[in-house]
């Protein structure tokens, strides 16, 4: 029904429009921003705008409607049309009269006939082909109601457990309720489209319960053989099972057994002597595994090592023999098997008279 909504200015208003005469659709509110002025005015998505500030929207385009809304500075007056909504309300009446202290919160019952099911929703009486209605049941059991009659309760001894089994097979969709002395047995076999449960097992359980309640020994039917004894497969399996089987031996074992039985040392043709591979054991005193010894102090070197002319030294032992200057990352000279810096090397190698000493460095 049409109603008028006034939004106080200024913008933004907090709603989104869609439609217009250019879209061949009415102007409809599609979105409301939470906490906005439109939400405070109780505007809802789906409201149809009939007029904006007194101007009808029948001939307005979408852009014209936006311009009308933007032109509203102090307030925006919208005339909207909102569809009716049906809300569920609880039943507060009982027998046509309102009950002040009792509220029934149960919803209205719905008819389930519009659902399509391959199987029965509600159990229906079983009808044997060739008969109009009803079913053949043992005495004292009502197939239509699924409950034993009062006369059957008084004459419990006349009920045979086998008859119950027959009745349950004739009417599988009808629950059977039997009241016996001191016990009440309810048999409700529902539809099983996938054959999840064996009908024979269910019937045997029902017959055993009734027989136990009546104080009788339950008579169970003998299980039928799944494989007929006359089949060829059945006879073949049982014939092989009855015959004693001899132990089987591998081909290599039979060859060795034949050699032992003959007692000859001659090897059969096509065989040769094969020795097992011998694993070589590496010695622990290999050259690569030996610890290098320092050329100066004579102790083993563990960690960083300095090598000069196939001689190993500790980094702290790699010094000049005269001034103990560390020669690492510097030039060094070997004179008579000793290390010297450049200064002391020049002092130890005096050239003949008339010659000067010139230092030559090896090319990298």
UniProtKB/Swiss-Prot annotation:
LIM zinc-binding domain boundaries: 292-351
UniProt keyword Cell inner membrane, yes or no: no
GO biological process: actin cytoskeleton organization; actin filament organization; heart development; muscle structure development
Residue ranges occupied by any PDZ domain in the UniProt entry: 1-84
Domain of life (superkingdom): Eukaryota
Tissues in which the protein is found: Isoform 1 is highly expressed in differentiated skeletal muscle. Isoform 2 is heart-specific.
Residues with the Phosphoserine modification: 18, 93, 264
Keywords tagged on the record: Cytoplasm, LIM domain, Metal-binding, Phosphoprotein, Zinc
Molecular function, one GO term: metal ion binding
PANTHER family: PDZ AND LIM DOMAIN PROTEIN 3 (PTHR24214:SF7), PDZ AND LIM DOMAIN PROTEIN ZASP (PTHR24214)
Subunit organization: Interacts with ACTN2. Forms a heterodimer with PDLIM4 (via LIM domain).
Function: May play a role in the organization of actin filament arrays within muscle cells.
UniProt protein name: PDZ and LIM domain protein 3
Gene coding for it: PDLIM3
């Amino acid at each position: 029904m049409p109603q008028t909504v006034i939004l106080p200015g200024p913008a933004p208003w907090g709603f989104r429009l869609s439609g217009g005469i250019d879209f061949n659709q009415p102007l409809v509110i599609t979105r409301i921003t939470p906490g906005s002025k439109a939400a405070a005015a109780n505007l809802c998505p789906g409201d149809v705008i009939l007029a904006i500030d007194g101007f009808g929207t029948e001939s307005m385009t979408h852009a014209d409607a936006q311009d009308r809304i933007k032109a509203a500075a102090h307030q925006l007056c919208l005339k909207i049309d909102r569809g009716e909504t049906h809300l569920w309300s609880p039943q507060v009446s009982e027998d046509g009269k309102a009950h002040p202290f009792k509220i029934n919160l149960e919803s209205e019952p719905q008819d389930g006939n519009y659902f399509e099911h391959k199987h029965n929703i509600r159990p229906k009486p079983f009808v044997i082909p060739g008969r109009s209605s009803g079913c053949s049941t043992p005495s004292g059991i009502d197939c239509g109601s699924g409950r034993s009659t009062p006369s059957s309760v008084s004459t419990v001894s006349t009920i045979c457990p086998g008859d119950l089994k027959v009745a349950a097979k004739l009417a599988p969709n009808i629950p059977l309720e039997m009241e016996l002395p001191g016990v009440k047995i309810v048999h409700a076999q529902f539809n099983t489209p996938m054959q999840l449960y064996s009908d024979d097992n269910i019937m045997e359980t029902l017959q055993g319960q009734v027989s136990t309640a009546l104080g009788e020994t339950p008579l169970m039917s003998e299980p039928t053989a799944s494989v007929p004894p006359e089949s060829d497969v059945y006879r073949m399996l049982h014939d092989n099972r009855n015959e004693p089987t001899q132990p089987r031996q591998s081909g290599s074992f039979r060859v060795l057994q034949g050699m032992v039985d003959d007692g000859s040392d001659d090897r059969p043709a096509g065989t040769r002597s094969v020795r097992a591979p011998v694993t070589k054991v590496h010695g622990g005193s290999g050259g690569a595994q030996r610890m290098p010894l320092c050329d100066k102090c004579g102790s083993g070197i563990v960690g960083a090592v300095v090598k000069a002319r196939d001689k190993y030294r500790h980094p702290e032992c790699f010094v000049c023999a005269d001034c103990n200057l560390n020669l690492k990352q510097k030039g060094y000279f070997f004179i008579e098997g000793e290390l010297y810096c450049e200064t002391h090397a020049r002092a130890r190698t005096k050239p003949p008279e008339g010659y000067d000493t010139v230092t030559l460095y090896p090319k990298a």
